[in-house]
């Protein structure tokens, strides 16, 4: 996700392309609950957002955003993605992929005006219905060169990706923009073209042609669109600018990616719109643009008004469109015409014909009086139309009303009715407009064809979208059928081809059927007996009607095809005749007028006028139209065979098939356009409409396959070349390694997710997004490498600069040292004296030197003048020599050119041979096609003959029925006469009979009409029959011509015999296949043994599982027994509770009997009773809960037992299947053994053939190798001789120049001797020069002799090699003489045939067709001969096929095993889930039990309070000492009972704990069983994978062997052909070499003769010199004078000689230095390589260290995550401990409250006791005072005392019971405290574990720091080593420079 700064590139378009960073952060911070937030199905909006409130009983309650509450099924609720995925750019990245998620993502982006969204591999765009600033130039620049993931979704991104793919993959691309009508396809097409015209612009304005208005190629491509839209777009119900034609725009690019040219193909222009529009539509834009009066000159030119309602053709619907400005559009259209280079005449004709179409609609006709014929109703409109079309108006009206029709061989004028004339006018208008449109497209293509070299193209497809109107006709069917085919192409490319590619490349893939096959609807329309076929068939019959067409459709398809339905009748809607179920919906079609539309008839008389029109454009449009009244022999030329049957539907299907074939040859990119609503409202989205389009277009399926599959793939070689930079060390240098292995090593060494790619046979496949990651890694790596390289270069440059600075520094030091030394001695006296004397010492010498210098100057001046004269002469000689040299070079060049021409001719002959062979193949293929066509024609002929016979039978039947009718007529007439005579009064019967007569007459007339129609039909069929018979005659004549060429084909028979040899070689291939099959059989035996062992393992595993199940069942029984014991204890405790309750009731009754209880005691008793009732209720609830838990536990145990039983059954079934497979494998092994026996028998037969063929192959290879060696020797000798010849020629030229120079110099010397005797010394000098030249010439002669001898030796060697080659050639010729002769003859004949073809192409085609037919016959005859030889081959192939079939069956078995394993694993996972749910329920039970314990504690506290109160009461009655002993006994008894109850309670708790332990043991055993099963499954998966790999390897080896044999066979054939060609070339080269050798020998002889001549001249010169010596005495004085000059010249000569020697010495020194530098360079290169290896080692060590550091970082991260997890666990434990602490505090608070209540009760009891004691004391005193006197009162007091005693006993008993309860509760409190302590201890242990993890984390962090330190140390070492290497290299450089 790019930042806001990166989005600034797009300018104002940025908010419309991608969310800002602020929005992204806000989305991430939004509150979101994944469990409650959801999408839910809604009846109105399809899907709405909501929150889950509750879920129970299979229903989910959801509250929607608009506060509605919905109760739906769980499957109607869909998960919602987190807010960070809102407005995601690629919907393939969504976490939850479902329909509502995709819908709301598109909706959210659409509301933010982000109309482009990626959907996996393609792009989805939603029509915004308004202008958005997302197509500006800065947006184009922003997308240029960007990868898909680097920029937001856009049509420009798709375009740029297609452009980049074209450049990198060198493959044609296509962009398919599809969608329903009004979805925005045309706009996106324009933007694509705009983008290509911008980024690939040539920028060469100089390419503009003559017209000033014409623009560049980019301008013309862009301008083509407005012109096409003006003439081809119109307003429809759904779209204001709907394309009413389809176009495929191909933009061609050159090798550099620049625009080269473009062309446009159009499909299916909707012609009917010219004359008819619906109410809410209008015609084509151009009519309304012209009428906008923006260009008034057009109104005058076309003779029209500005009111559209004046023209019925264009005013049937709407006139104005709010979103289109017709006036501005007219200017754009006119400008586009100019830019596209239309001439003024063409432009005028374009407008005129458009205006004429409008005028056609105003032409009126009326019916003649008393006739049905039509006549013109006024001629004004016809005059205008004729003027615009360049016609005569009267001729036009006559042709319309009275056209000429051909009847037989004569032409008849036929009268037309008014309706017929109107139909003709409409047809002509549509035809003119259509042809005008097609001409315009052709003219645009001519202009866009720049003839520049072009390599690849990108095609942009824009067709009319899917349409469902109220009235749908043939045009809508064609449009919808085209969209159906394109959708099928998309489905096939996205879902079928993609998965087939995975299978073909050997990638593990389970085929997914997305259910997107549209073949049923397509076949219904285009297959034989489909809709188009029936339509074309009906068009052939003259009396066919739309009704008969409809009836045929119903008979053929209604009820037989699900896609063909009868339409429902809807009131107010146009009548429909049938319905088709398309991919985008069901469409009702009306067949009205389909036959006429399909036949498309024209008034041929008017067309003839068009062809003679003065309007050149109109005449050009109809120049190729064939009419029946064409002149003379033009008929055959103008009209091809069968063109009369070319219907609109047939032409449409042909164009559509061509388009689909074009698309299949390109790499497609899909853009899906979506309509958001039907009202064209910006920003509004109808959910149902958008969902319908998404489902039809396969958007969700495309995303799914993009996520599951591997959408990106690269060839291994390309991947290695492009991404090797990521880790170059992974691929070793200097040794060959397979590209696949290299890619595997490379990817394994990169830090990526290794599950995101797969290796195929030829390509590596990537998941979506991984290739982008690799590209980013590559960019980063390249950036690092470039910066590293820059750093090294800059460092090197700075070091060089530093060395220069050091040299300058040393020089400065030297200068400074000398200057300082001079400054020190400057003022020394002796030095001053030296400065003064030194000039004086040299003054005398200088004078002498000056005099000598003057003399020398004069001498040198004279010598200079002489040398200048000599130099001029030598320059003249040099010019002549250069001219001679150039002449020789021209001769040599001419010879070399001749040689090259000969070689080129040889190459051309070879190429011509190959071309002829290819043409022969093409001809044979075409012959096969012609034979197929011939067979089809004969079948059609037979069919037509059958139909003719049937028609004749029908005619005979009709004649018989006619005769019968005549007889019946006569009979009825006689009856009528008799009845009138006999029954004159019966008028009613007479009337009845007359009515019957009339009916019979009508039937008779009808039969006569039918008979006439059948006769017409028979006539047409007879014409067709005659035509077909003519074709048959032509074919028979061509067959006779083929028989003549049969002699040529007999020669090809020998070629086929050579193919027999190839077939024998294929037998060798089959031998190898047999060996491989043997190996596969062995492998299958081994695999069978492995499977047996696996079956045994499975049996043992099933036995173990059965044992475990039995053990588990025993444990379950034990648990049930324990539960029964628990119930018994519960019953016992319940019984005790009831006893206690009964005793308590008795005590209460006794207390009620006691009368003296105080009010406080009564209140306490009530309070105790209420508390007791509360305790009873709590206890009952606890028992109920306990029983519920026991029931659930029992149920879960039963479920687990049932699951285990099911697992046993599954294992039993698996066992049975394994046994079945075992038996099947045994049968397969038997079959394989039988096949092996048959193969072994065939092997014995094939071995003999194999041996013979191997011997022949080895001989051929040996000879081939010898030939190649000899050829290589000859080529080397040839090259050496050529170089030697060139050297000799150069030396000869030099010698000739020297000789000529010597001769000229000799003549000059003789003249000088005769004329000027004083130049004797110069002659001596010339003599010396001649002597030197003589020596050099002799040396050169020696060299020439040596070279000549070497050349003679080379010639001898060459002759020997030539003789050897000739002998080998003779051998080859004897061996292949017949083949060579045959080939030469074939070549000569092919040349003749080629010349004949070039002269007459039509004759060539016929000859080739005939030849192909005879070829096919001979081929069939020879194939019959070959079949006998191929019996063994077919047998072996059948065996291989059987083995392959068995292998496929085995693969199926393996797949079934895998599915079974997956099912068992799923069942195991379900069992594990159930066990987890059991454990959670057990945990809930524990919580419930703890809550019950809490309630028991509260009850215990209350009992304790009661016990305290009872204790107070006992203290009150303690004064009565008599009952203390009894109370003590009862107390002991109560304690015993309390102990029993306590023991029972402890036993219950122990039983519960025992149950918990057992459950834990069961869970552990379940986990063990799960792990065991997982291990077994993993082992099985590994074994299955091993089997798959073994089979894959065997298949690969077999395929590789087969490919190798095929390659070797092809290589042998190629070598054979190459050797034959090389032999011819060698012969030609030998002849050239012989000629050159003869020429060089002649040249040498001439040179030797010249050398002899020069020798004679030299002898003469010596003799002349001797004569001159005799004359020396005479010229002695002259010699003395000239002696000084000679000496001076000699000195200068010596000086020049010394300079020459010095230069030579310097040259030698420089060569030595070069050698030294070369050696130093090589040593430096070696050291550099060594250092580079060291550096790579160091880099690898650094990378290892970095890897270790990364591993340490990962460990640290892992430790951090572990610490975080432990911290979370600690937090949880702390929370639980805090909860327990809170519970503890609550318990303590309740204890305090109870203690407080107990104190209060004690105080109350004490107060009441004191009062009673005081009363008793007063009573005792009263009794003591009145003891004697009142006996009665004494007895009463004794009774009262006894009552009190009973009451005390009861109270003491109750107090003991309460005390026991209190003690029991106290024990429970103690246990709870123990548990609290244990929880505290667990919390402390958790703290300790957290501390331990923290220490581990600190330790890991410490290790990480140490690893980082080690990495830093390693990096510093690397830097040191680098510094050392730099120092070493710099020192070597310094040493090297010092040596220099």
Swiss-Prot record:
Sequence positions that bind ATP: 179-186
- Positions of the UniProt region annotated as Actin-binding: 656-678, 758-772
SUPFAM superfamilies membership: Myosin rod fragments (SSF90257), P-loop containing nucleoside triphosphate hydrolases (SSF52540), Tropomyosin (SSF57997)
Q: Where in this protein does the record put region Disordered? A: 1260-1289
- Subcellular location, in the record's words? Cytoplasm, Myofibril
GO BP terms: ATP metabolic process; skeletal muscle contraction
Q: Name one GO cellular component term.
A: contractile muscle fiber
In what residue span(s) does the Myosin N-terminal SH3-like domain sit? Answer: 33-82
| Family membership | Belongs to the TRAFAC class myosin-kinesin ATPase superfamily. Myosin family.
**Protein known as:** Myosin-3
Taxonomic path: Eukaryota, Metazoa, Chordata, Craniata, Vertebrata
């Amino acid at each position: 996700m790019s930042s806001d700064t990166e989005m600034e590139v797009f300018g104002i378009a940025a908010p419309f392309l991608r969310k800002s960073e602020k929005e992204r952060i806000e989305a991430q911070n939004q509150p979101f609950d994944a469990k409650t937030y959801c999408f839910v199905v809604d009846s109105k909006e399809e899907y709405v957002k909501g929150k889950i409130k509750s879920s129970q009983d299979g229903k989910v309650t959801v509250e929607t955003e608009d506060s509605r509450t919905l109760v739906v099924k769980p499957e109607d609720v869909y998960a919602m993605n987190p807010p960070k995925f809102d407005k995601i750019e690629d919907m393939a990245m969504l976490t939850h992929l479902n329909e509502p998620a995709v819908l709301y993502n598109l909706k959210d982006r659409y509301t933010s005006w982000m109309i482009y969204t990626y959907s996996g591999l393609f792009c989805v765009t939603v029509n915004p219905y308004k202008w958005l600033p997302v197509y500006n130039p800065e947006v184009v620049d922003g997308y240029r060169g960007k990868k898909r993931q680097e920029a937001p979704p856009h049509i420009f991104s798709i375009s740029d990706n297609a452009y980049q793919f074209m450049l990198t993959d060198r493959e044609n691309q296509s962009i398919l923009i599809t969608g329903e009508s009004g979805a925005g396809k045309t706009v996106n097409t324009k933007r694509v073209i705009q983008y290509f015209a911008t980024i690939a612009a040539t920028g060469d304005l100089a390419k503009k042609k003559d017209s000033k208005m014409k623009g560049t190629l980019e301008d013309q491509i862009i301008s083509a669109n407005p012109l096409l839209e003006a003439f081809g777009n119109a307003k429809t119900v759904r779209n204001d600018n709907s394309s009413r034609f389809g176009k495929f725009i191909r933009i061609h690019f050159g090798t550099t990616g620049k625009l080269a040219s473009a062309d446009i193909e159009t499909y299916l222009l909707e012609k009917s719109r010219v004359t008819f529009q619906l109410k809410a539509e209008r015609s084509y834009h151009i009519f309304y643009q012209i009428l906008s009066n923006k260009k008034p000159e057009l109104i005058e030119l076309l003779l029209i008004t500005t009111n559209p309602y004046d023209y019925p053709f264009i005013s049937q619907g709407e006139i104005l469109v709010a979103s289109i400005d017709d006036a501005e559009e007219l200017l754009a259209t006119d400008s586009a015409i100019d830019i596209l280079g239309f001439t003024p005449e063409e432009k005028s004709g374009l407008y005129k014909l458009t205006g004429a179409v409008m005028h056609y609609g105003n032409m009126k006709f009326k019916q003649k009086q008393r006739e049905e014929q039509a006549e013109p109703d006024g001629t004004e409109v016809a005059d205008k139309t004729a003027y615009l079309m360049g016609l005569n108006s009267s001729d036009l009206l006559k042709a319309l009303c009275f056209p000429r029709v051909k009847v037989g061989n004569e032409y008849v004028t036929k009268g037309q009715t008014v309706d017929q004339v109107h139909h003709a006018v409409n047809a002509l208008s549509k035809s003119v407009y259509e042809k005008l449109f097609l001409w315009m497209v052709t003219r645009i293509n001519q202009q866009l064809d720049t003839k520049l070299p072009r390599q690849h193209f990108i095609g942009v497809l824009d067709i009319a979208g899917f349409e469902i109107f109220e009235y749908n006709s043939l045009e809508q069917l064609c449009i919808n059928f085209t969209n159906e085919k394109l959708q099928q192409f998309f489905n096939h490319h996205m879902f079928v081809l993609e998965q087939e590619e995975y299978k073909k490349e050997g990638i593990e893939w389970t085929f997914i059927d997305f259910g997107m096959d549209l073949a049923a609807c397509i076949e219904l329309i285009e297959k034989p007996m489909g809709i188009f076929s029936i339509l074309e068939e009906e068009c052939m019959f003259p009396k066919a009607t739309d009704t008969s067409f409809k009836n045929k459709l119903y008979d053929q398809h209604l009820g037989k095809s699900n896609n063909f339905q009868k339409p429902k009748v809807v009131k107010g809607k146009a009548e429909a005749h049938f319905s088709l179920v398309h991919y985008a919906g069901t469409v009702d079609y009306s067949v009205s007028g389909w036959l006429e539309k399909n036949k498309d008839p024209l008034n041929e008389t008017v067309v003839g006028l068009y062809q003679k029109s003065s309007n050149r454009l109109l005449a050009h449009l109809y120049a190729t139209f064939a009419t029946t009244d064409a002149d003379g022999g033009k008929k055959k030329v103008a009209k091809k065979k069968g063109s009369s049957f070319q219907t609109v539907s047939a032409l449409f299907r042909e164009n559509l098939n061509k388009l689909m074939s074009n698309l299949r040859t390109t790499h497609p990119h899909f853009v899906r356009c979506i309509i958001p609503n039907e009202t064209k409202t910006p920003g509004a989205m109808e959910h149902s409409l958008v969902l319908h389009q998404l489902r039809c277009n396969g958007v969700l399926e495309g995303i799914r396959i993009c996520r599951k599959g591997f959408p990106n793939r690269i060839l291994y070689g390309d991947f290695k070349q492009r991404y090797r930079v990521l880790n170059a060390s992974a691929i070793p240098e200097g040794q060959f390694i397979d590209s696949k292995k290299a890619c595997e090593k490379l990817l394994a060494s990169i830090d990526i997710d290794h599950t995101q790619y797969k290796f195929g046979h030829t390509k590596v496949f990537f998941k979506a997004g991984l290739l982008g990651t690799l590209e980013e890694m590559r960019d980063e790596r390249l950036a690092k490498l470039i910066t590293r390289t820059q750093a090294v270069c800059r460092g090197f440059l700075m070091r060089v600069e530093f060395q220069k600075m050091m040299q300058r520094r040393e020089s400065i030091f030297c200068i400074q040292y000398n200057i300082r030394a001079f400054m020190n001695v400057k003022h020394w006296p002796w030095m001053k004296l030296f400065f003064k004397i030194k000039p004086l010492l040299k003054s005398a010498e200088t004078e002498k030197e000056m005099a000598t210098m003057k003399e020398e100057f004069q001498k040198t001046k004279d010598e200079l003048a002489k040398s200048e004269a000599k130099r001029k002469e030598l320059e003249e000689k040099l010019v002549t020599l250069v001219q001679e040299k150039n002449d020789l070079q021209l001769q040599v060049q001419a010879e070399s050119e001749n040689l090259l021409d000969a070689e080129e001719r040889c190459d051309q002959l070879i190429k011509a041979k190959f071309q002829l062979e290819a043409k022969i193949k093409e001809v044979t293929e075409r012959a096969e096609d012609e034979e197929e066509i011939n067979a089809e024609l004969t079948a059609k002929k037979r069919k037509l003959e059958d139909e003719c016979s049937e028609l004749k039978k029908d005619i005979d039947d009709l004649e018989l029925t006619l005769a019968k009718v005549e007889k019946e007529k006569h009979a009825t007439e006689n009856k009528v006469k008799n009845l009138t005579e006999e029954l004159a009064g019966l008028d009613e019967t007479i009337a009845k009979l007359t009515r019957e007569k009339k009916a019979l007459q009508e039937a008779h007339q009808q039969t006569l009409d039918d008979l006439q129609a059948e006769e017409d039909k028979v006539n047409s069929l007879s014409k067709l029959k005659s035509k077909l018979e003519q074709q048959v005659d032509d074919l028979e004549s061509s067959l006779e011509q083929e028989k003549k060429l049969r002699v040529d084909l007999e020669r090809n028979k020998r070629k086929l015999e050579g193919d027999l040899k190839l077939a024998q070689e294929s037998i060798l291939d089959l031998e190898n296949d047999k060996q491989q099959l043997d190996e596969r059989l062995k492998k299958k035996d081994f695999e069978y043994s492995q499977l047996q062992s696996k079956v045994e393992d499975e049996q043992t595993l099933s036995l173990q599982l059965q044992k475990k199940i039995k053990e588990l069942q025993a444990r379950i029984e034990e648990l049930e027994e324990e539960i029964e014991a628990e119930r018994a204890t519960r019953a016992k405790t319940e019984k005790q509770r009831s006893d206690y309750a009964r005793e308590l009731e008795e005590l209460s009754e006794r207390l009620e009997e006691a009368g003296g209880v105080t009010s406080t005691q009564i209140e306490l008793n009530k309070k105790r009773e209420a508390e007791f009732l509360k305790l009873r209720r709590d206890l009952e609830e606890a028992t109920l809960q306990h029983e519920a838990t026991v029931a659930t536990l029992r149920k879960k145990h039963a479920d687990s037992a049932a699951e285990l039983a099911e697992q046993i059954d599954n294992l039993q079934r698996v066992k049975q299947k394994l046994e079945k497979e075992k038996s099947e494998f045994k049968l397969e092994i038997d079959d394989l053994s039988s096949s092996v026996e048959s193969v072994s028998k065939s092997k014995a037969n094939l071995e003999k053939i194999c041996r013979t063929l191997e011997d022949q192959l080895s001989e051929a290879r040996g000879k081939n190798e010898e030939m190649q060696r000899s050829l290589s020797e000859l080529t080397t000798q040839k090259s050496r001789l050529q170089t030697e010849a060139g050297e000799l020629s150069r030396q000869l030229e030099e010698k000739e120049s020297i000789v000529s120079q010597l001769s000229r110099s000799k003549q000059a010397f003789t003249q000088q001797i005769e004329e000027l005797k004083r130049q004797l010394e110069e002659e001596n000098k010339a003599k010396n020069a001649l002597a030197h030249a003589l020596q050099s010439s002799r040396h050169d002669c020696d060299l020439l002799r040596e070279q000549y001898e070497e050349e003679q030796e080379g010639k001898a060697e060459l002759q020997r090699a030539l003789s050897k080659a000739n002998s080998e050639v003779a051998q080859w010729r004897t061996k292949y003489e017949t083949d060579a002769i045959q080939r030469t003859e074939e070549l000569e004949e092919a040349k003749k045939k080629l010349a004949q073809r070039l002269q007459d192409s039509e004759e060539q085609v016929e000859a080739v067709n005939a030849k192909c037919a005879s070829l096919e016959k001979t081929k069939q005859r020879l194939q019959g001969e070959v079949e006998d030889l191929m019996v063994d081959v077919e047998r072996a192939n059948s065996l291989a096929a059987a083995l392959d079939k068995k292998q496929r069956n085995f693969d199926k078995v393996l797949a079934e095993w895998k599915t079974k394993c997956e099912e068992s694993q799923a069942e195991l996972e379900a069992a594990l889930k159930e066990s987890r749910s059991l454990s959670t329920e057990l945990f809930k039970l524990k919580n419930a039990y703890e809550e019950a314990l809490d309630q028991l504690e509260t009850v215990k506290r209350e009992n304790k309070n009661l016990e305290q109160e009872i204790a107070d009461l006992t203290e009150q009655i303690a004064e009565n000492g008599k009952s203390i002993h009894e109370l003590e006994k009862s107390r002991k008894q109560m304690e015993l009972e309390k102990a029993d109850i306590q023991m029972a309670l402890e036993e219950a708790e122990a039983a519960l704990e025992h149950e918990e332990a057992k459950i834990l043991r069961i869970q552990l055993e379940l986990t063990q069983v799960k792990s065991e099963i997982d291990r077994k499954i993993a082992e099985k998966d590994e074994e299955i994978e091993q089997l798959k790999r073994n089979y894959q390897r065997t298949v690969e080896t077999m395929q590789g062997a087969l490919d190798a044999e095929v390659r070797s066979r092809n290589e042998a054939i190629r070598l054979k052909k190459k050797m034959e060609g090389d032999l011819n070339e060698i012969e030609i080269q030998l002849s050239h070499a012989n000629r050159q050798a003869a020429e060089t020998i002649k040249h040498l002889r001439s040179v030797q003769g010249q050398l002899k001549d020069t020798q004679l001249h030299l002898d003469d010169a010596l003799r002349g010199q001797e004569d001159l010596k005799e004359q020396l005495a005479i010229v002695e004085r002259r010699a003395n004078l000239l002696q000084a000059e000679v000496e001076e010249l000699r000195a200068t000569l010596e000086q020049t000689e010394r300079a020459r020697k010095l230069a030579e010495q310097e040259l030698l020194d420089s060569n030595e230095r070069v050698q030294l530098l070369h050696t130093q360079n090589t040593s430096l290169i070696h050291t550099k390589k060594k250092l580079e290896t060291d550096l790579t080692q160091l880099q690898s060590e650094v990378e290892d260290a970095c890897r270790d550091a990364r591993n340490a970082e990962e460990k640290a991260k892992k430790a951090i995550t572990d610490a975080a997890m432990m911290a979370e666990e600690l937090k949880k434990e702390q929370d639980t401990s805090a909860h327990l602490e809170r519970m503890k505090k609550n318990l303590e608070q309740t204890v305090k409250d109870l203690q407080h209540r107990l104190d209060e009760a004690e105080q109350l009891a004490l107060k009441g006791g004191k009062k009673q004691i005081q009363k008793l004391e007063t009573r005792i005193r009263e009794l003591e005072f009145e003891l004697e006197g009142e006996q009665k009162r004494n007895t009463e007091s004794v009774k009262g005392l006894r009552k009190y005693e009973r009451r005390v006993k009861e109270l003491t008993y109750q107090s003991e019971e309460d005390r026991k309860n209190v003690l029991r509760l106290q024990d429970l409190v103690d246990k709870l405290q123990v548990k609290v302590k244990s929880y505290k201890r667990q919390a402390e242990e958790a703290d300790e574990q957290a501390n331990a993890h923290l220490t581990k984390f600190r330790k890991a962090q410490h290790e990480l720091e140490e690893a980082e330190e080690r990495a830093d140390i390693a990096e510093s070492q690397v830097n040191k080593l680098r510094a050392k290497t730099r120092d070493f290299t710099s020192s070597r450089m310094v040493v090297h420079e010092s040596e220099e």
